[in-house]
């Protein structure tokens, strides 16, 4: 069969790297069809092309083999051999060495390499060669399709080049295939015409033609059917976008130099895509807008020729595009353009049409007035007609012929220009105004006056119309406007107003305008004119004082001024103005431009100001101080005693003066009660407001009705009241930055002088950054205290005065406790004055802003007072800090003299991160203190704080004694307390703080450098935010963190006084709580909290989240600290000192307690978890010796390193002891750790004791040095891993005592052991077994273990107690382990102990049901003692006394019964002792070997009850009675046990019951015996017989007659003992000694028939070889023969089973006394010499 094309292609590549032609493949398919693969390899390898490919073939002996290997790897797989990840060094070395093995390997190497790669599964290599072969065949097919079937050398080389690029990737194959397609397509090329003329075109061909022909013939079949289409010539003319797209869609490629141009609409061009982007150049055929032109210009091949039609806005917005256009057409000629835009359009220098409209500001139009932009506009529109024009500008605009017909204008110019302008210009204006800079126009004409008066700002200018002009001579004139100026005559200056002038006003508002300056000769400052009816005086003083004197009579030259209402004084260059005795009350006074401290003084005839509601309006404008000189304004009646009750004060009247400060002294305006202030200039009242002033209003409120509605004063106001007496002040300041201070006391008496009717001042700073100070006191018989309102702005408020009254306290930013009225801004509020009253305390609202609030003694300020709140019924400041980050500090104390009432400050932080510090104490009078009225109290003076004096201080009876007392106390002589308080102040008050939103810091306690300790019983709420709350004073506090991650720190308190018992509640968030000293209550709240109680008896409540209690046990006693964990909460609790739970502690969630003391600690949870549905705890010990008692629930206890004592108490516990020697009980442990009455029903525990010599009990562990009354409850189902070390492990109850163990104390008389699982690990001989002082490795008991030590200490039971063992599983370890299934009882050596089991019952029979422990015991390695049910050992000086006395006592005065369970016991490796039921041992000898009979001394419970040699007949009869009695009192029923010896020389004691005993089969896989060579099965006396009543037959498996043996007990009342003959003096016994036994072996019975055990005994009788009746010699001194017989049952129900019968030495065969055992898997047969298999020993078990 011919090789496939793929194989041929692959071989060609492997040896030549070349392709194969179609003709090559045809040869291999025909002529070479019979060539095998091996032959083909040889042909290719020996070809010339292979020698060319691999130069190695030409000189293989001298060539480089490594190079050859490299070439082959590269040729086949494109792999570089230097890449060790692809070609391991080992492989490379292999192939180089392989080439040297044989010359034939040279040529075969490419083939061998590929075969080896395939065998190794190197798929990447195989894939690479496969890809190369596929590409080679693709090349062959492509050329064959084009008609090329035989390759030229060039085509072979071309194929090789393509193949060489291929590797194992798909990408390399695709790239090669693309090259092949391109090569194939180039083989046949036609023009369209040629292709149309060719009848049979090849399957693959190319069309190559001009672009124009391709566009025309795009749909021709010869074009669409071509493999490739080439445009070989550019189009003759520009193409449309459509044609260009046809060209690109048709032509697969363009020949070199072929390009095309585009000429089409702009829309088609911009949407043309590749047709446009690929063009050589692009042109358009239409007009475009600016955006389109911009897009076209973005094309890199656009020819740049375009015309634009668009809006003026778009054209102007893009000058770059617009400037390049050949023409511009405006699409919105009706939309106006700016001057700049019109200038741009005119500057383009290209046709622009149609014309446009200009709209712009007057300034821009005027600037371009004669330019083409304005001249060529169709219309010009001014768009800011509200902007004034000068006269010249208005004329220029009006001269434009294309000005918009609706043009309006306003004019602003100087008076000269306005006067010179055509009247039509002013008449046509909407309005006009003057621009003169000097407001004083001087003397003008009436025409000018008309123009001035027509101006919108006429009121800003002063001018005089020359109606009446005074002369230096006497003028007696009448008129409306009088002008008096200084004139020059003859070179001298004369004032024109003099004493001889008589001026009479006429018309409306007659006015005298007066300019006064120093005269050249005989300057006069005081004149006496007669002014009648002149209502307004405008006086300007120029460096000259003026006094106008009015007498009260009308005489020329004597002065008389009447009718004057308004005075305007101006002192630009200085001068005092004084008007004396005016005969008419003034209405307004204006003082302006007083810069040099000149004064103004007016007096008015007394009758004119005799009323009680006179009003004066005073205006000050630009009245400034000049150094120490301040302008003083004095206005009063002529006598100087009366004046205006109401004063309206305006500071500044024009906006140009805003920012100046008017500084005036208005103290001379007498009798003023109310002052209303408005204006815009700053105002400083340089002297105190007088005592009559009680109202100041700068807000226009209704406080002063006459000024209600006036504008709020916006300047900065400075004013103060000194300490002159007066009424309560209400001061409402304006919106500036004000400085107001009040030193006046609020102390107003009633008309009868009996009552204080004052309440306190009210000071409102209004808006602005104000400094508000009240140093005066406030006294009242009702409600005493000042009110200060900062208003908006950053205010500084200081209150140093005392507030004293029944209700006493200053109020800041409110009028009461409820209604906040201001306080925005960052305020600084300082109150040092005390509040004294029945109810006393200041109230502060901080409002918005970052406020600093201080109440207390401030040593940085020279002020008095301590900021204390001193009350009878209630005392304490109230602070509402408000929004933002505030600071509140209170150093003043709160005190109530009535101990039953409240004392303490209250602070609300509001939003923001606040700092709140209170160092003031919260005090009340001690209940035992005595209040005594001060006999020297002066009720006409303000009272001071009540005076505390010592309890033994006598009350002064004389003024002298009183002054001495004050001096002793360091108080001033005028100290005026209302009462003496004899006693001490008590810390029983409470400050209350609420932090509000924000991260607040709240501190109670001393502040550095401040008075007070912060003592008291405080309450704080952190609210939202991460708050820090701390108490460092003395007292007990309650802190609530609120939302956020808070830190709460309680105080240390004073244990002597009982303080420091804090309540801390973290609320929401992750909080830290520290109680400090005292008995604290800590509750974490929501979130993950950390709580530390500090010293004292603390209570922790974990109500949610994951909380950490850091210092449980740091208390006054072990039960001091307690905690509770809520449902769904988790607590990590660090126990720092010994700790004991009480009923307060419970866990409904997850609680983990960790002992922190490395030296060890104690945790006792026994009293915890009183509520229902509680959960257990996790307790983790430290490296020291820990004592841990669990709860009644399911606990997890980890003792850690150290010698720990652990009791799980109730519940299903998990206990781990870790390293070292531990005492562990799954439930109760008495070391003594736990009172006996606390022992509870036990849980199902999981205990891992870890390494160390541990003592472990699943339920109860007692180790005590005293007598103990033991109370047994039912045991739990425990799992115990004892771990490494010598461990004492008991499944249920373990008791060790240096005293008596009284089992009578059990409340329940039946105790049921749990089904326990116990495992242990390698011990270290660390246990001294209590009998014989034998060192053992581990001691395991399934249910009950009890041991007593000490002289005379006993285990006794006189009341009936039933112990039912559990079904336990116990596994030992290597070493000597003692494992007991149910009960182990021991008394120590030489201590004369008794184990009294009177009325003790092991197991229970209830009807047909037997309850006993069915245990599974595995000894593992080592020589083990394994007992299924009971192990009792007692050592005493008296020996064994059964009936009374010391020793092991059974059944005295009661009934003792043992019921064994059906146990499974496996010895494992080692020489083990296996007992199925009960073992009573008197002595174990050290070193102990369970196979050495000398190491055992077993107890015979019957020994002392049998007759002895030499007994009389009566004694023998009594012995029989005693024995019979014991058999009634002591009953034992063994279980059906399974005993498996395992390896080693094991000893078996099946005991009572039908036991199954596997003594080993001694066979391994290798045929070597692995079980013991000498294994022993024990059989005791009649009551331990294996065939009691024919039903108790043991089954022994694996008996090897060569090695194993039966050991029988010999001696009195035991098997092989013979029979006691009544009346004989000597009881006959077998004369058999250990090691000298002689047995008589009968022939086996091989075909017995038996349906039951009795049938087996009958088989012995029936087939006995001696006769029907066995007879033995029983004479004393002679050895006896004991018959043995093997019985094989061949029929009946027991068919197939084998038995061994042994007679007990009495001739008759008896199922009651003789021995029968079933043998299974017996190895060998018994020989005549039976010594190796049978032995008699003296022992009792």
Swiss-Prot record:
Summary of the knockout phenotype: The deletion mutant has similar pigmentation, but a more flat, spread morphology and a shiny surface. It displays a smooth lipopolysaccharide surface as its most peripheral layer. Viability of the mutant is reduced upon exposure to lysozyme treatment and hypo-osmotic stress.
GO MF annotation, one: calcium ion binding
Domain of life per record: Bacteria
Keywords tagged on the record: Cell wall, Glycoprotein, S-layer, Secreted
Post-translational modifications reported in the UniProt record: Glycosylated.
Any one cellular-component term (Gene Ontology): S-layer
UniProt xrefs under InterPro entries: Bluetail_dom, Hemolysin-typ_Ca-bd_CS, Hemolysn_Ca-bd, RTX_toxin/Mannuronan_C5-epim, Serralysin-like_metalloprot_C
Location in or out of the cell: Secreted, Cell wall, S-layer
Residues covered by region (Disordered): 894-913
Pfam families (alphabetical): HemolysinCabind
Domains (record comment): Contains GGXGXDXUX nonapeptide motifs, which are found in members of the repeat in toxin (RTX) protein family, and which are implicated in Ca(2+) binding. Binds Ca(2+) and shows Ca(2+)-induced reversible conformational changes.
Function: S-layer protein. The S-layer is a paracrystalline mono-layered assembly of proteins which coats the surface of bacteria. Under laboratory conditions, has a supportive but not a critical role in the function of the cyanobacterium. Shows no apparent hemolytic activity against sheep erythrocytes, however, a slight hemolytic activity is detected during the conformational change caused by the rebinding of Ca(2+).
Name used for this protein in its record: S-layer protein
Organism: Synechocystis sp. (strain ATCC 27184 / PCC 6803 / Kazusa)
């Amino acid at each position: 069969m011919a090789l496939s094309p793929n194989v041929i292609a692959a071989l060609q590549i492997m040896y030549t790297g070349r392709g194969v032609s179609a003709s090559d493949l045809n040869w291999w398919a025909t002529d070479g069809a019979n060539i095998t693969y091996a032959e083909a390899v040889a042909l290719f390898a020996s070809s010339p092309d292979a020698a060319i490919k691999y130069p190695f073939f030409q000189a293989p002996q001298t060539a480089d083999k490594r190079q050859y290997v490299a070439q082959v790897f590269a040729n086949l797989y494109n792999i570089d051999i230097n890449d060790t990840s692809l070609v391991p060094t080992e492989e490379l070395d292999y192939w180089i060495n392989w080439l040297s093995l044989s010359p034939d390997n040279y040529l075969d190497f490419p083939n061998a390499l590929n075969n080896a790669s395939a065998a190794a599964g190197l798929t990447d290599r195989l894939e690479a060669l496969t890809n190369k072969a596929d590409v080679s065949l693709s090349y062959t097919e492509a050329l064959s399709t084009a008609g090329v079937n035989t390759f030229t050398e060039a085509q072979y080389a071309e194929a090789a080049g393509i193949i060489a690029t291929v590797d194992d990737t798909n990408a390399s194959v695709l790239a090669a295939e693309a090259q092949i397609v391109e090569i194939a397509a180039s083989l046949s090329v036609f023009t369209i015409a040629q292709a149309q003329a060719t009848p049979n075109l090849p399957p693959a061909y190319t069309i190559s033609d001009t672009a124009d022909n391709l566009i025309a013939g795009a749909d021709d079949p010869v074009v669409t059917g071509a493999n490739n289409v080439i445009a070989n010539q550019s189009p003759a003319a520009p193409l449309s976008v459509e044609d260009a797209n046809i060209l690109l869609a048709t032509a697969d490629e363009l020949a070199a130099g072929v390009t095309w141009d585009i000429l089409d609409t702009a829309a088609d061009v911009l949407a043309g895509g590749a047709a446009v982007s690929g063009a050589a150049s692009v042109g358009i055929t239409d007009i475009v807008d600016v955006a389109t032109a911009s897009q076209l210009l973005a094309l890199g091949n656009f020819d740049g020729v375009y015309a634009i039609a668009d809006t003026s806005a778009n054209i102007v917005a893009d000058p770059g595009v617009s400037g390049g256009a050949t023409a511009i057409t405006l699409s919105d000629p009706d939309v106006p353009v700016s001057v700049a835009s019109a200038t741009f359009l005119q500057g383009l220098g290209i046709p622009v049409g149609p014309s446009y409209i200009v709209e712009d500001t007057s300034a821009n139009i005027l600037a371009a007035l004669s330019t083409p932009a304005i001249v060529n506009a169709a219309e010009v529109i001014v768009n800011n007609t509200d902007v004034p024009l000068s006269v010249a500008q208005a004329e220029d605009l009006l001269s434009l012929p294309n000005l918009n017909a609706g043009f309006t204008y306003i004019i602003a110019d100087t008076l000269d220009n306005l006067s010179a302008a055509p009247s039509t210009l002013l008449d046509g204006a909407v309005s006009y105004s003057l621009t003169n800079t000097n407001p004083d126009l001087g003397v003008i004409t009436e025409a000018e006056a008309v123009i001035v008066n027509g101006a919108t700002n006429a009121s800003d200018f002063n001018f005089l119309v020359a109606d009446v002009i005074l002369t230096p001579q006497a003028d007696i004139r009448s008129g409306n406007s009088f002008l008096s100026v200084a004139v020059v005559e003859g070179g001298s200056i004369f004032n024109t107003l003099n004493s001889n002038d008589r001026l009479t006003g006429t018309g409306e508002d007659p006015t005298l305008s007066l300019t006064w300056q120093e005269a050249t000769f005989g300057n006069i400052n005081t004149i006496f004119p007669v002014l009648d009816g002149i209502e307004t005086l405008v006086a300007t003083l120029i460096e000259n004082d003026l006094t106008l004197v009015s007498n009260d009579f009308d005489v020329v030259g004597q002065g008389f001024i009447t009718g004057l209402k308004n005075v305007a004084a101006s002192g630009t260059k200085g001068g005092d103005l004084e008007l004396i005795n005016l005969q008419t009350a003034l209405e307004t006074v204006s003082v302006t431009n007083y810069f040099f401290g000149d004064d103004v003084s007016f007096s008015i005839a007394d009758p004119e100001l005799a009323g009680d509601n006179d009003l004066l309006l005073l205006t000050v404008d630009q009245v400034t101080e000049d150094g120490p000189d301040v302008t003083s304004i004095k206005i009063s009646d002529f006598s100087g005693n009366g004046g205006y009750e109401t004063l309206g004060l305006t500071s500044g009247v024009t906006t140009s003066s805003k920012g100046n400060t008017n500084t005036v002294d208005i103290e001379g305006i007498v009798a003023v009660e109310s002052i209303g202030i408005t204006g815009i200039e700053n105002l400083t009242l340089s002297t105190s407001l007088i005592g009559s002033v009680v109202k100041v209003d700068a807000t226009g409120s209704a406080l002063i009705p006459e000024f209600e509605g006036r504008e709020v004063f916006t300047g900065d106001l400075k004013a103060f009241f000194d300490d002159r007496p007066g009424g309560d002040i209400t001061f409402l300041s304006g919106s500036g930055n004000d400085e107001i201070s009040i030193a006046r006391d609020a102390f107003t008496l009633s008309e009868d002088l009996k009552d204080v009717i004052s309440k306190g001042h009210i000071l409102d700073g209004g808006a602005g950054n104000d400094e508000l100070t009240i140093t005066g006191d406030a006294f009242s018989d009702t409600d005493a205290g000042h009110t200060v309102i900062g208003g908006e702005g950053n205010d500084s408020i200081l209150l140093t005065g005392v507030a004293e009254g029944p209700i006493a306290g200053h109020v800041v930013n409110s009028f009461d406790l409820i209604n906040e009225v201001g306080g925005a801004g960052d305020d600084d509020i300082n109150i040092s004055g005390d509040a004294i009253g029945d109810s006393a305390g200041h109230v502060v609202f901080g409002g918005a802003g970052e406020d600093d609030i201080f109440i207390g003694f401030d040593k940085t300020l020279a002020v008095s007072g301590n900021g204390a709140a001193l009350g009878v019924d209630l005392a304490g400041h109230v602070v509402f800090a408000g929004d933002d980050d505030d600071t509140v500090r209170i150093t003043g104390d709160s005190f109530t003299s009535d101990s039953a009432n409240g004392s303490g400050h209250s602070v609300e932080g509001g939003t923001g991160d606040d700092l709140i510090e209170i160092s003031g104490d919260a005090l009340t009078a001690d209940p035992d203190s005595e209040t005594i009225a001060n006999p020297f109290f002066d009720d006409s003076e303000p009272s001071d704080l009540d005076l505390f004096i010592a309890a033994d201080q006598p009350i002064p009876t004389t003024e002298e004694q009183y002054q001495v007392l004050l001096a002793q106390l360091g108080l001033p002589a005028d100290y005026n307390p209302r009462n003496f308080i004899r006693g001490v102040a008590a810390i029983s008050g409470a400050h209350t703080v609420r932090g509000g939103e924000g991260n607040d810091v709240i501190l109670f306690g001393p502040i550095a450098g401040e008075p007070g300790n912060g003592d008291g019983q405080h309450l704080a709420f952190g609210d939202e935010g991460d708050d820090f709350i701390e108490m460092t004073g003395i007292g007990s506090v309650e802190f609530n963190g609120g939302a956020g991650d808070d830190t709460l720190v309680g105080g240390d308190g004073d244990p002597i006084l009982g303080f420091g018992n804090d309540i801390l509640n973290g609320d929401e968030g992750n909080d830290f709580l520290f109680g400090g000293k005292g008995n604290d209550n800590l509750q974490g709240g929501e979130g993950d909290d950390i709580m530390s109680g500090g010293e004292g008896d603390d209570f922790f409540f974990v109500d949610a989240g994951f909380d950490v209690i850091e210092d449980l046990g740091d208390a006054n006693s072990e039960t001091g600290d307690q905690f509770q964990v809520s449902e769904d909460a988790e607590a990590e609790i660090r126990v720092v000192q010994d700790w004991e739970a009480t009923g307060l502690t419970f866990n409904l969630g997850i609680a983990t307690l960790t002992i922190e003391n490395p030296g060890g600690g104690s945790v006792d949870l026994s009293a915890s978890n009183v509520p229902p549905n509680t959960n257990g705890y996790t307790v983790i010990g430290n490296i020291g010796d820990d004592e841990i008692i669990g709860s009644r629930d399911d606990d997890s206890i980890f003792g850690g390193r150290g010698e720990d004592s652990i009791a799980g108490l109730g519940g299903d516990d998990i206990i781990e002891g870790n390293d070292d020697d531990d005492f562990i009980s799954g439930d109760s442990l008495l070391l003594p750790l736990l009172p006996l009455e606390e022992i509870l029903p036990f849980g199902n525990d999981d205990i891992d004791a870890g390494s160390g010599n541990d003592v472990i009990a699943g339920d109860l562990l007692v180790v005590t040095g005293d007598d103990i009354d033991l109370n047994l409850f039912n045991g739990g189902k425990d799992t115990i891993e004892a771990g490494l070390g010598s461990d004492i492990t008991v499944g249920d109850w373990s008791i060790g005592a240096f005293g008596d163990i009284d089992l009578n104390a059990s409340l329940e008389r039946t105790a049921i052991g749990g089904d326990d699982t116990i495992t242990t690990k390698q011990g270290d001989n660390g246990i001294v077994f209590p009998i014989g002082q034998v060192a053992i490795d581990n001691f395991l008991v399934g249910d009950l273990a009890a041991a007593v030590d000490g002289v005379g200490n006993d285990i006794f039971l006189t009341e009936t107690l039933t112990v039912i063992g559990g079904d336990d599983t116990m596994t030992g370890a290597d070493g000597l382990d003692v494992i007991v299934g149910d009960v182990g009882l021991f008394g120590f050596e030489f201590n004369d102990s008794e184990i009294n089991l009177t009325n003790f019952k092991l197991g229970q029979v209830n009807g047909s049901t037997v309850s006993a422990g069915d245990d599974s015991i595995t000894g593992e390695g080592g020589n083990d003692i394994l007992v299924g049910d009971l192990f009792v050992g007692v050592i005493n000086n008296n020996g064994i006394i059964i009936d009374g006395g010391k020793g092991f006592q059974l059944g005295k005065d009661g009934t003792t019964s043992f019921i064994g369970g059906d146990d499974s016991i496996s010895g494992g490796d080692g020489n083990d002792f296996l007992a199925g039921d009960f073992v009573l041992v008197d002595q174990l000898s050290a070193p102990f070997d369970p196979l050495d009979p000398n190491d055992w001394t077993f107890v015979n419970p019957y020994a002392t009850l049998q007759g002895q040699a030499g007994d009389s007949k009566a004694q023998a009869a009594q012995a029989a009675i005693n024995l019979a009695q014991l058999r009634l009192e002591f009953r034992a029923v063994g279980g059906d046990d399974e005993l498996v010896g395992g390896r080693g020389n094991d000893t078996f004691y099946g005991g009572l019951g039908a036991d199954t005993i596997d003594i080993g089969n001694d066979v391994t896989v290798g045929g070597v015996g692995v079980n013991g060579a000498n294994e022993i099965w024990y059989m005791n006396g009649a009551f331990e017989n294996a065939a009691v009543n024919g039903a108790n037959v043991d089954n022994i498996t694996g008996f090897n007659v060569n090695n194993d043996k039966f050991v029988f007990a010999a001696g009195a009342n035991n098997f092989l003992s013979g029979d006691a003959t009544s009346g004989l003096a000597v009881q006959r016994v077998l004369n058999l000694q250990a090691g000298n036994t002689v047995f008589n072996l009968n022939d086996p019975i091989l075909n017995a028939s038996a349906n039951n055990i009795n049938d087996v005994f009958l088989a012995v009788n029936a087939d006995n070889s001696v006769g029907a009746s066995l007879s033995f010699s029983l004479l004393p001194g002679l050895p006896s023969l004991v018959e043995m017989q093997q019985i094989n049952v061949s029929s009946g129900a027991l068919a197939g089973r084998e038995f061994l019968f042994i007679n007990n030495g009495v001739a008759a065969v008896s199922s009651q006394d003789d021995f029968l055992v079933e043998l299974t898997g017996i190895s060998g047969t018994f020989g005549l010499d039976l010594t190796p298999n049978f032995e008699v020993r003296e022992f009792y078990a």
